[in-house]
Amino acid sequence: MIEDEVPDTDDPAAPAPAPWKVLIVDDDVDVHVVTKFSLSNAVFMGRRLSFLHAYSGEEALQMLRQHDDIALVLLDVIMETTDAGLRVATRIRDELHNALVRIVLRTGQPGQALEHGIILDYDINDFWCKTDLTTRKLFTTVIASLRGYHSLSEAQRLVAAVQTQLAALQQPLQAAVEAVRAGTDWSGTVALGEPAVRMTLAARPAAGHGSPPVTV
């Protein structure tokens, strides 16, 4: 496994934005070299690309465990076995439970499997024959994948923020409910004289301008 250094920015005084992490998985060293060279100048949303390298399925999974912010995996289908890439794609989703990372399968032997069936049966985002994946098409595929990753990441972040806000709102609400329950008699009538209820009512905002809090 190899991790390339993040490229420097033109302005050394400015903080460099975090690069997009792209994991190249292939047992052919030349594929790593050519892929990195083809994308060396790629920039998306002001961020460069940082390349991670794995040469087998197990190395790829280990790298993904170490880096939970990998945005894209360029994954060879045939490595230590004829379906190594397909197995890795499945384990990324089912074992690592990583639904964010974009997976682009690449194969040098298109006759080994039907593209249509792979797209339907595996949770991947694109499938290419290496001979068809020109520099221009590779760039387009990578940028589209990064855009998808960014959109999913933002959606996940917003959901987490909403859940945090709901949890914060639920605490005082639960306290009020417990206070009301503590001040309810056997018939279900709120006993306003109970200390817990008096405290809850006193803590409420005033009903009008200048009105004092309600006390019992």
Task: Give the role of each language-model region.
Residues A113, T131-V142:
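C-terminal output helix
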Residues F51-E59:
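Conserved Asp/Asn-Gly motif in the active-site loop of CheY-like receiver
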Residues M1-L23, V29-S50, R157-T164, Q171-Q174, ...:
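Non-catalytic signal-transmission and effector/linker regions of two-component phosphorelay proteins
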Residues D121, K137-H150:
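Receiver (REC) domain switch/output surface
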Residues N41, E58-R65, I78, A84-A99, ...:
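Short amphipathic alpha-helix used as the core "switch/output" element in two-component signaling
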Residues V104-T107, K130:
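Hydrophobic/aromatic residues positioned on beta-strands within the core alpha/beta folds
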Residues P19, D68-L72, L96-I103:
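His-Asp phosphorelay/catalytic-motif detector in bacterial-type signaling
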Residues D26, L74-I78:
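Active-site residues of response regulator receiver
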